Amino acid sequence: MTASTSVAVGCAVGIPVGVGIIIAVCFWFNLQKRYKREEQDDRELERAIYDESGFVSFDNFGPLRDSKDEAALASSELKNPDHTSGSSEGSAHPEEKDGKSRDQEKPLGKKNSKYYVPAYRRKINLLQVRNNNYGNNARQKSVVDLPSINNSSNVSLSSSQRHITKRQISVYDQMVPVISDEGPKFFADPSSDTNTSNDQNKASMIELKHNTRQSINENLIRKLQNQDFGSYYPRRASSSFLNGNISNASFHTRNSSITSVNKRDALEDVFATPKSAAQSQLPNTFDKDNEGIDADHSVKDSRSAITDKDKDIYKLQNNYDVGNIGEIAEEDQYENEFTNYSQSKREFIESLRPK
Protein backbone atom coordinates (compact mmCIF):
# COMPACT_ATOMS: atom_id res chain seq x y z
CA MET A 1 0.00 0.00 0.00
CA THR A 2 2.79 2.41 0.86
CA ALA A 3 4.61 1.70 -2.42
CA SER A 4 1.47 2.20 -4.47
CA THR A 5 0.71 5.42 -2.59
CA SER A 6 4.19 6.86 -3.20
CA VAL A 7 4.02 5.90 -6.87
CA ALA A 8 0.63 7.54 -7.21
CA VAL A 9 1.82 10.72 -5.51
CA GLY A 10 4.99 10.79 -7.63
CA CYS A 11 3.03 10.36 -10.83
CA ALA A 12 0.46 12.95 -9.80
CA VAL A 13 3.16 15.53 -9.06
CA GLY A 14 5.99 14.55 -11.42
CA ILE A 15 4.04 14.14 -14.65
CA PRO A 16 2.53 17.70 -14.68
CA VAL A 17 5.86 19.22 -13.61
CA GLY A 18 7.72 17.33 -16.34
CA VAL A 19 5.18 18.33 -18.99
CA GLY A 20 5.41 21.96 -17.88
CA ILE A 21 9.21 21.89 -18.07
CA ILE A 22 9.12 20.41 -21.56
CA ILE A 23 6.63 23.05 -22.73
CA ALA A 24 8.75 25.81 -21.19
CA VAL A 25 11.87 24.52 -22.97
CA CYS A 26 9.99 24.45 -26.29
CA PHE A 27 8.83 28.05 -25.79
CA TRP A 28 12.35 29.10 -24.86
CA PHE A 29 13.79 27.61 -28.05
CA ASN A 30 11.13 29.35 -30.15
CA LEU A 31 11.87 32.63 -28.40
CA GLN A 32 15.59 32.27 -29.08
CA LYS A 33 14.91 31.64 -32.76
CA ARG A 34 12.72 34.71 -32.88
CA TYR A 35 15.43 36.80 -31.23
CA LYS A 36 18.00 35.59 -33.77
CA ARG A 37 15.65 36.42 -36.61
CA GLU A 38 15.06 39.92 -35.24
CA GLU A 39 18.79 40.49 -34.77
CA GLN A 40 19.40 39.47 -38.37
CA ASP A 41 16.70 41.87 -39.57
CA ASP A 42 18.22 44.64 -37.48
CA ARG A 43 21.63 43.95 -38.99
CA GLU A 44 20.15 44.16 -42.48
CA LEU A 45 18.43 47.42 -41.63
CA GLU A 46 21.66 48.89 -40.23
CA ARG A 47 23.51 47.81 -43.34
CA ALA A 48 20.87 49.52 -45.49
CA ILE A 49 21.01 52.69 -43.37
CA TYR A 50 24.79 52.98 -43.12
CA ASP A 51 25.32 52.21 -46.77
CA GLU A 52 26.48 55.29 -48.65
CA SER A 53 25.76 54.10 -52.18
CA GLY A 54 22.15 53.24 -51.34
CA PHE A 55 21.35 56.88 -50.57
CA VAL A 56 23.59 58.80 -52.95
CA SER A 57 23.03 56.95 -56.24
CA PHE A 58 19.98 54.85 -57.00
CA ASP A 59 21.79 52.90 -59.72
CA ASN A 60 23.94 50.88 -57.32
CA PHE A 61 21.67 48.47 -55.44
CA GLY A 62 24.38 45.89 -54.85
CA PRO A 63 24.98 46.60 -51.14
CA LEU A 64 21.24 46.42 -50.42
CA ARG A 65 20.98 42.96 -51.92
CA ASP A 66 21.01 39.80 -49.84
CA SER A 67 23.75 37.23 -50.36
CA LYS A 68 21.18 34.54 -51.21
CA ASP A 69 19.59 36.85 -53.76
CA GLU A 70 23.05 37.41 -55.24
CA ALA A 71 23.54 33.68 -55.60
CA ALA A 72 20.12 33.37 -57.23
CA LEU A 73 20.95 36.18 -59.67
CA ALA A 74 24.30 34.61 -60.49
CA SER A 75 22.70 31.22 -61.17
CA SER A 76 20.02 32.85 -63.33
CA GLU A 77 22.70 34.67 -65.32
CA LEU A 78 24.60 31.42 -65.81
CA LYS A 79 21.47 29.64 -66.98
CA ASN A 80 20.26 32.54 -69.11
CA PRO A 81 20.65 31.69 -72.82
CA ASP A 82 20.64 35.39 -73.73
CA HIS A 83 24.34 35.73 -72.77
CA THR A 84 25.58 32.90 -74.97
CA SER A 85 26.17 34.94 -78.08
CA GLY A 86 25.91 38.56 -79.00
CA SER A 87 24.73 37.93 -82.56
CA SER A 88 21.68 35.93 -81.51
CA GLU A 89 20.78 38.61 -78.96
CA GLY A 90 21.15 41.32 -81.54
CA SER A 91 18.88 39.50 -83.97
CA ALA A 92 16.18 38.91 -81.38
CA HIS A 93 13.07 41.10 -81.30
CA PRO A 94 12.80 43.68 -78.45
CA GLU A 95 9.35 42.34 -77.45
CA GLU A 96 10.87 38.89 -76.90
CA LYS A 97 13.57 40.47 -74.71
CA ASP A 98 10.94 42.20 -72.58
CA GLY A 99 9.09 38.90 -72.18
CA LYS A 100 12.26 37.14 -71.06
CA SER A 101 13.05 39.87 -68.54
CA ARG A 102 9.54 39.57 -67.09
CA ASP A 103 9.96 35.81 -66.83
CA GLN A 104 13.19 36.39 -64.92
CA GLU A 105 11.57 38.85 -62.54
CA LYS A 106 8.74 36.51 -61.49
CA PRO A 107 10.82 33.61 -60.12
CA LEU A 108 13.13 36.04 -58.33
CA GLY A 109 10.20 37.58 -56.50
CA LYS A 110 8.91 34.15 -55.43
CA LYS A 111 12.26 32.60 -54.52
CA ASN A 112 13.36 31.95 -50.96
CA SER A 113 9.82 31.71 -49.65
CA LYS A 114 11.23 29.86 -46.64
CA TYR A 115 12.83 33.11 -45.38
CA TYR A 116 11.09 36.37 -44.72
CA VAL A 117 12.06 39.13 -47.18
CA PRO A 118 10.74 42.65 -46.51
CA ALA A 119 8.69 44.44 -49.13
CA TYR A 120 11.27 47.16 -49.69
CA ARG A 121 13.94 44.50 -50.31
CA ARG A 122 11.77 42.82 -52.93
CA LYS A 123 11.18 46.11 -54.72
CA ILE A 124 14.88 46.90 -54.68
CA ASN A 125 15.72 43.47 -56.10
CA LEU A 126 13.18 43.89 -58.89
CA LEU A 127 14.56 47.32 -59.73
CA GLN A 128 18.09 45.91 -59.76
CA VAL A 129 17.06 43.14 -62.14
CA ARG A 130 15.45 45.66 -64.47
CA ASN A 131 18.48 47.93 -64.40
CA ASN A 132 20.80 45.00 -65.11
CA ASN A 133 18.62 43.88 -68.02
CA TYR A 134 18.48 47.37 -69.50
CA GLY A 135 22.24 47.78 -69.11
CA ASN A 136 22.94 44.41 -70.71
CA ASN A 137 20.61 45.18 -73.61
CA ALA A 138 22.25 48.55 -74.23
CA ARG A 139 25.73 47.06 -74.02
CA GLN A 140 24.81 44.22 -76.39
CA LYS A 141 23.28 46.63 -78.89
CA SER A 142 26.33 48.90 -78.83
CA VAL A 143 28.86 46.05 -78.95
CA VAL A 144 27.50 43.53 -81.46
CA ASP A 145 30.64 42.76 -83.44
CA LEU A 146 32.84 42.17 -80.38
CA PRO A 147 33.49 38.56 -79.28
CA SER A 148 31.17 36.89 -76.83
CA ILE A 149 33.68 37.15 -73.95
CA ASN A 150 32.46 40.67 -73.19
CA ASN A 151 28.92 39.36 -72.61
CA SER A 152 29.89 36.35 -70.51
CA SER A 153 28.68 35.73 -66.98
CA ASN A 154 32.17 36.29 -65.54
CA VAL A 155 31.98 39.99 -66.35
CA SER A 156 28.60 40.35 -64.66
CA LEU A 157 29.79 38.44 -61.59
CA SER A 158 32.91 40.57 -61.24
CA SER A 159 30.92 43.78 -61.67
CA SER A 160 28.36 42.67 -59.10
CA GLN A 161 31.10 41.67 -56.64
CA ARG A 162 32.76 45.03 -57.15
CA HIS A 163 29.63 46.82 -55.93
CA ILE A 164 29.34 44.73 -52.74
CA THR A 165 31.23 46.95 -50.29
CA LYS A 166 30.25 47.16 -46.66
CA ARG A 167 30.58 50.66 -45.27
CA GLN A 168 29.87 51.55 -41.68
CA ILE A 169 29.91 55.35 -42.17
CA SER A 170 26.61 56.96 -43.03
CA VAL A 171 26.20 59.71 -45.58
CA TYR A 172 24.64 61.94 -42.95
CA ASP A 173 27.84 61.72 -40.87
CA GLN A 174 29.90 63.03 -43.78
CA MET A 175 27.56 65.81 -44.93
CA VAL A 176 28.53 69.39 -44.03
CA PRO A 177 25.68 71.84 -44.73
CA VAL A 178 26.72 75.05 -46.47
CA ILE A 179 24.33 78.00 -46.09
CA SER A 180 24.78 81.21 -47.99
CA ASP A 181 24.57 84.60 -46.27
CA GLU A 182 22.64 86.13 -49.13
CA GLY A 183 19.47 84.09 -48.63
CA PRO A 184 17.42 83.88 -51.86
CA LYS A 185 20.57 84.16 -54.01
CA PHE A 186 21.63 80.68 -52.91
CA PHE A 187 19.58 79.04 -55.68
CA ALA A 188 20.40 81.59 -58.39
CA ASP A 189 21.99 80.47 -61.64
CA PRO A 190 25.73 81.30 -61.70
CA SER A 191 26.77 83.40 -64.69
CA SER A 192 29.09 86.27 -65.48
CA ASP A 193 26.34 88.90 -65.45
CA THR A 194 24.79 87.71 -62.23
CA ASN A 195 28.20 87.49 -60.54
CA THR A 196 28.90 91.18 -61.10
CA SER A 197 25.40 92.14 -59.98
CA ASN A 198 25.74 89.93 -56.91
CA ASP A 199 29.04 91.61 -56.00
CA GLN A 200 27.46 95.04 -56.33
CA ASN A 201 24.45 93.99 -54.27
CA LYS A 202 26.72 92.52 -51.62
CA ALA A 203 28.78 95.72 -51.41
CA SER A 204 25.62 97.83 -51.13
CA MET A 205 24.23 95.56 -48.41
CA ILE A 206 27.48 95.83 -46.42
CA GLU A 207 27.44 99.62 -46.76
CA LEU A 208 23.78 99.77 -45.70
CA LYS A 209 24.47 97.62 -42.63
CA HIS A 210 27.42 99.85 -41.71
CA ASN A 211 25.31 103.01 -42.06
CA THR A 212 22.46 101.62 -39.97
CA ARG A 213 24.88 100.48 -37.27
CA GLN A 214 26.53 103.91 -37.22
CA SER A 215 23.17 105.69 -36.97
CA ILE A 216 22.11 103.40 -34.11
CA ASN A 217 25.34 104.18 -32.26
CA GLU A 218 24.83 107.92 -32.77
CA ASN A 219 21.28 107.74 -31.41
CA LEU A 220 22.50 105.79 -28.40
CA ILE A 221 25.23 108.34 -27.68
CA ARG A 222 22.72 111.18 -28.01
CA LYS A 223 20.35 109.49 -25.57
CA LEU A 224 23.14 108.85 -23.10
CA GLN A 225 24.18 112.49 -23.24
CA ASN A 226 20.63 113.63 -22.52
CA GLN A 227 20.28 111.34 -19.52
CA ASP A 228 20.87 112.66 -16.00
CA PHE A 229 22.81 110.00 -14.09
CA GLY A 230 24.07 112.31 -11.30
CA SER A 231 20.92 112.80 -9.23
CA TYR A 232 17.78 110.90 -8.42
CA TYR A 233 15.59 113.93 -9.12
CA PRO A 234 15.76 115.92 -12.39
CA ARG A 235 18.13 118.82 -12.35
CA ARG A 236 17.07 122.44 -12.63
CA ALA A 237 19.04 124.94 -14.66
CA SER A 238 20.19 127.92 -12.62
CA SER A 239 22.41 130.92 -13.31
CA SER A 240 23.52 131.37 -9.68
CA PHE A 241 26.97 130.38 -8.47
CA LEU A 242 28.44 129.05 -5.23
CA ASN A 243 30.01 131.03 -2.46
CA GLY A 244 33.78 131.20 -2.61
CA ASN A 245 34.41 130.94 1.11
CA ILE A 246 32.97 127.44 1.41
CA SER A 247 35.61 124.76 1.50
CA ASN A 248 35.19 121.57 -0.54
CA ALA A 249 35.96 119.36 2.44
CA SER A 250 33.13 120.68 4.62
CA PHE A 251 30.55 121.29 1.89
CA HIS A 252 28.48 118.13 1.34
CA THR A 253 25.05 119.48 0.45
CA ARG A 254 23.57 119.48 -3.06
CA ASN A 255 24.10 122.34 -5.49
CA SER A 256 20.38 122.75 -6.05
CA SER A 257 19.78 123.41 -2.34
CA ILE A 258 21.95 126.54 -2.30
CA THR A 259 22.13 128.00 -5.78
CA SER A 260 18.40 128.61 -6.05
CA VAL A 261 18.36 131.09 -3.10
CA ASN A 262 21.80 132.79 -3.17
CA LYS A 263 22.07 136.48 -3.98
CA ARG A 264 24.17 137.85 -6.79
CA ASP A 265 24.97 141.24 -5.32
CA ALA A 266 26.21 140.33 -1.86
CA LEU A 267 26.96 136.67 -1.22
CA GLU A 268 26.85 135.57 2.37
CA ASP A 269 28.11 132.60 4.27
CA VAL A 270 25.41 129.96 4.39
CA PHE A 271 26.71 128.54 7.66
CA ALA A 272 26.63 131.92 9.41
CA THR A 273 23.84 133.11 11.69
CA PRO A 274 20.87 134.25 9.53
CA LYS A 275 19.60 137.84 9.80
CA SER A 276 16.21 139.36 9.28
CA ALA A 277 17.52 141.77 6.63
CA ALA A 278 18.85 138.92 4.57
CA GLN A 279 15.57 137.07 4.90
CA SER A 280 13.59 140.10 3.75
CA GLN A 281 15.59 140.24 0.53
CA LEU A 282 14.99 136.60 -0.35
CA PRO A 283 11.94 137.10 -2.61
CA ASN A 284 13.81 139.60 -4.79
CA THR A 285 16.76 137.28 -5.23
CA PHE A 286 14.44 134.40 -5.95
CA ASP A 287 12.74 136.37 -8.73
CA LYS A 288 16.11 137.23 -10.22
CA ASP A 289 17.12 133.59 -10.27
CA ASN A 290 13.90 132.58 -11.99
CA GLU A 291 14.57 135.09 -14.76
CA GLY A 292 17.94 133.50 -15.62
CA ILE A 293 16.62 130.04 -16.65
CA ASP A 294 17.69 128.55 -20.00
CA ALA A 295 15.37 128.34 -23.02
CA ASP A 296 15.39 124.50 -23.16
CA HIS A 297 13.73 124.16 -19.75
CA SER A 298 11.40 127.14 -20.03
CA VAL A 299 8.16 125.15 -19.73
CA LYS A 300 9.29 123.13 -16.73
CA ASP A 301 10.81 126.13 -14.96
CA SER A 302 7.70 128.25 -15.50
CA ARG A 303 5.59 125.60 -13.84
CA SER A 304 8.06 125.21 -10.99
CA ALA A 305 8.26 129.02 -10.57
CA ILE A 306 4.48 129.22 -10.17
CA THR A 307 4.48 126.49 -7.56
CA ASP A 308 7.56 127.90 -5.76
CA LYS A 309 5.98 131.35 -5.37
CA ASP A 310 3.09 129.83 -3.47
CA LYS A 311 5.35 127.81 -1.19
CA ASP A 312 7.46 129.07 1.68
CA ILE A 313 11.06 129.82 0.87
CA TYR A 314 13.57 127.76 2.81
CA LYS A 315 17.18 128.67 3.34
CA LEU A 316 20.03 126.74 4.84
CA GLN A 317 20.35 128.20 8.32
CA ASN A 318 21.03 127.33 11.93
CA ASN A 319 18.39 126.63 14.56
CA TYR A 320 18.64 130.02 16.27
CA ASP A 321 18.21 133.66 15.29
CA VAL A 322 19.56 136.53 17.40
CA GLY A 323 17.25 139.10 15.84
CA ASN A 324 14.10 137.08 16.50
CA ILE A 325 14.48 135.28 19.81
CA GLY A 326 10.76 134.72 20.35
CA GLU A 327 10.42 132.55 17.21
CA ILE A 328 12.09 129.18 17.09
CA ALA A 329 13.30 128.10 13.66
CA GLU A 330 12.84 124.34 13.34
CA GLU A 331 14.46 123.97 9.97
CA ASP A 332 17.07 121.36 9.24
CA GLN A 333 20.57 122.17 8.07
CA TYR A 334 20.41 119.59 5.26
CA GLU A 335 16.97 120.52 4.03
CA ASN A 336 16.66 121.48 0.37
CA GLU A 337 13.97 122.02 -2.24
CA PHE A 338 13.24 118.28 -2.46
CA THR A 339 13.28 117.36 1.24
CA ASN A 340 10.84 120.01 2.52
CA TYR A 341 9.48 117.95 5.36
CA SER A 342 9.19 121.03 7.64
CA GLN A 343 6.48 122.41 5.37
CA SER A 344 4.77 119.05 5.43
CA LYS A 345 4.99 119.14 9.20
CA ARG A 346 3.33 122.56 9.29
CA GLU A 347 0.58 121.41 6.96
CA PHE A 348 0.01 118.37 9.16
CA ILE A 349 -0.24 120.56 12.28
CA GLU A 350 -2.64 122.89 10.49
CA SER A 351 -4.80 119.94 9.49
CA LEU A 352 -5.07 118.83 13.12
CA ARG A 353 -6.51 122.15 14.23
CA PRO A 354 -10.31 122.26 14.58
CA LYS A 355 -12.10 124.09 11.83
UniProtKB/Swiss-Prot annotation:
Q: How does it sit in the membrane?
A: Single-pass type III membrane protein
The reply on keyword Transmembrane is yes
Q: Where are the transmembrane segments?
A: 9-29
Q: What biological process terms from GO does the record include?
A: cell wall organization
Major location category of this protein: membrane
User: Which regions face the Extracellular side of the membrane?
Assistant: 1-8
Specify residue ranges for compositional bias: Basic and acidic residues.
92-108, 286-298
Q: Which residue pairs form cystines in this protein?
A: none
Which residues carry the post-translational modification Phosphoserine, per the record?
A: S142
Q: Which UniProt keywords apply?
A: Cell membrane, Cell wall biogenesis/degradation, Membrane, Phosphoprotein, Signal-anchor, Transmembrane, Transmembrane helix
Role played: Plays a role in cell wall integrity. Affects the cell wall polymer composition in the growing region of the cell.
Regarding protein family, the annotation reads: Belongs to the SKG1 family.
Question: What is the official name of this protein in its record?
Answer: Suppressor of lethality of KEX2 GAS1 double null mutant protein 1
Q: Which organism is it from?
A: Saccharomyces cerevisiae (strain AWRI1631)
Write the gene name.
Answer: SKG1
